[in-house]
Structure formats: C-alpha cells, structure tokens
Curated annotation (Swiss-Prot):
Binding locations of ATP: 5-9, 39, 142, 147-152, 166
Name under which the protein is recorded: [5-(aminomethyl)furan-3-yl]methyl phosphate kinase
Keywords in alphabetical order: ATP-binding, Kinase, Magnesium, Nucleotide-binding, Transferase
Coiled coil: none
Length: 216
C-alpha cells in the first residue's frame, strides 16, 4: 500500500495527478491511499486564530476538518471514492485499488497529535501511515523537493531527517515523527505526475527522499 499526501497548495492543479494515480493503481494492481492537505480552508482557520486568539485545541480541530473539505474536492474532480474510517477504506480499496481518506474522524477520535500549528497535514499523514502500517509516505506539493537553503539553494536528492533544519516544505514536527515512526518520505512536485509515478516505481527523478533512520 502507498500513501500519497496531496497538499492543499495543489488544490487547483491536482486533477492530472489524481488521474495519473487512479490509472496507475488500476493498471498495476497497487493500492494507493490519498490524504488531502487543508489548503485555503486551513489558511482561513489560521487567519481567524490570529485575529481572535482561539484555543490551540479548536484551531487543531478546525484545521483537521479542513483536510476533509479538500478531500471531498479531490474525490469529485478525480472521480475517486472517499472514506472517513479505516474499516471502510481497507474494505473498499481491495476492489477500487485507490481511495481518498477523509481523516478528521480518525485523527480527532484518537487525539494522537499535538494541538499545535507545528503539526500540519504533512505530519498528520505520518500518523495515518503508522495506523496503516506503511513505511513510506509521498508528500506531493508545489515545490521540487527540499533545498539546502532558500532562496537560491541546491535541491537535495536525499537527506537524513536529523539534518532538516528550517526553510523546508514540510512542517517542523515532520522529521521528528519520521524518525520516531521509522519511516521514509519523499517530497515531490505534484504538478509533474510522472515524478510521483517514478517514486512509486522506485525510479530516479526530481524529488527529495527523507530518511527517518540514523544512517542513509
């Protein structure tokens, strides 16, 4: 099983990637779970939080629900079914090979993540990966990967989670959880579906692999 988290930054550009993932899953008999980011909906929550100083718990709850909203959008434009429980997802993915997970029910009922803006949908996708016993997560976003500095830096092909320090396209908690869960991740530009397909195939392309173990 593969997990592909499609960030909210790709909301308006996600359709080709969704189509490519759906075709790949069916043609290769591979199971793919898509986890949505919070997108512009989450940005509205941030704005309200900043203006009204609402509690961390409420911000956390609302931001997670935003992932469901983007997930519903991806489900419609990608013609992919969406589910809000692991039971339904696991059952249906055996037939469909691909599904979108609307994660709020799972994440809020288990309350497994810290209530903080330090944890975004990137890190939440790792929690889902742990629940599904998946060892790798693909983070499809609007940048080519992780750079050694920004702006004007060099794209890194591979990096240890221990070495990620600021100015990255993943949240600050992501490398910590990656090490804790002993997982690997790929950061890739989702506007180029062929790059995501190459990760699924184990082929080299333009992306960054983040290794969540002590040594690469």
């Amino acid at each position: 099983m593969h997990i592909v988290k499609i960030g909210g930054s790709l909301t308006y550009d996600a359709k080709p990637l969704l189509k490519a993932l759906k075709n790949y899953a069916k043609e290769n008999n591979k199971k793919i779970v898509i986890i949505p980011g919070g997108g512009e909906f989450a940005n509205v929550v941030r704005k309200i939080d900043k203006a009204l100083n609402i509690s961390n718990s409420l911000s956390h709850k609302l931001a997670i629900k935003c992932m469901d909203l983007i997930g519903e959008v991806y489900a419609e434009i990608g013609y992919i079914k969406a589910y809000d429980t692991l039971f339904d997802l696991k059952r249906e993915i055996e037939k469909e090979k691909i599904a979108i997970l609307l994660p709020s029910k799972i994440l809020l009922s288990t309350d497994i993540a810290e209530h903080s803006w330090a944890i975004t949908s990137d890190s939440l996708s790792l929690y889902i990966g742990k629940l599904l016993d998946v060892r790798e997560v693909i983070i499809a976003t609007d940048v080519d990967g992780i750079y050694d500095k920004f702006p004007g830096g060099k794209l890194l092909n591979i990096i240890n989670a221990n070495d990620i320090k600021g100015l990255t396209s993943v949240d600050e908690t992501f490398p910590i959880l990656l090490k804790q869960f002993k997982m690997n991740a790929y950061v890739v530009n989702g506007r180029h579906p062929e790059r995501v397909m190459d990760i699924l195939e184990g082929k080299h392309n333009i992306y960054t692999k983040i290794v969540g173990i002590d040594k690469i």
